Design a protein with these regions (language model features):
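Functional cores of ribonucleases/endoribonucleases
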Residues: 1-109
Length: 109
């Protein structure tokens, strides 16, 4: 958690990766889980929730550069890859990388 909150982890939104999950953007990929809002909204979610969720670990116990968050409000929709059905969700995963972070809405439960 302290690593996620530190300056070592890039928390700026990576526009290219995030736009794949914003339906109003040119980069949106049909069938992906999507975020309500825009890049600024995604950045606000990272700033608010970074370091507050559950870190995802590899089998070896190393941090997988991901964090699972359950927010107070609906942030987007998780799309079932098999059925294509979208369900509103408060759960999301922040993916952290050298080039920045992006958010992927996830199915609750």
């Amino acid at each position: 958690r302290s690593l996620i909150c530190s300056a070592e982890v890039n928390k700026a939104i990576h526009a290219g990766a995030q736009n794949k999950h914003i339906p109003s953007s040119k980069g949106y990929i049909e069938g992906r889980s999507y975020l309500f809002g825009d890049l600024e909204g995604a950045q606000a979610l990272v700033e608010r929730y970074a370091g507050t969720g559950t870190a995802v670990l590899t089998r070896k116990g190393d941090w997988a550069n991901k964090e699972i968050i359950l927010s107070d409000e609906v942030i987007g929709a998780a799309v079932d890859l098999e059925t294509g059905k979208a369900e509103e969700t408060k759960k999301f995963v922040i993916h952290y990388g050298k080039s920045g972070a992006h958010i992927v809405p996830a199915k609750e439960g």
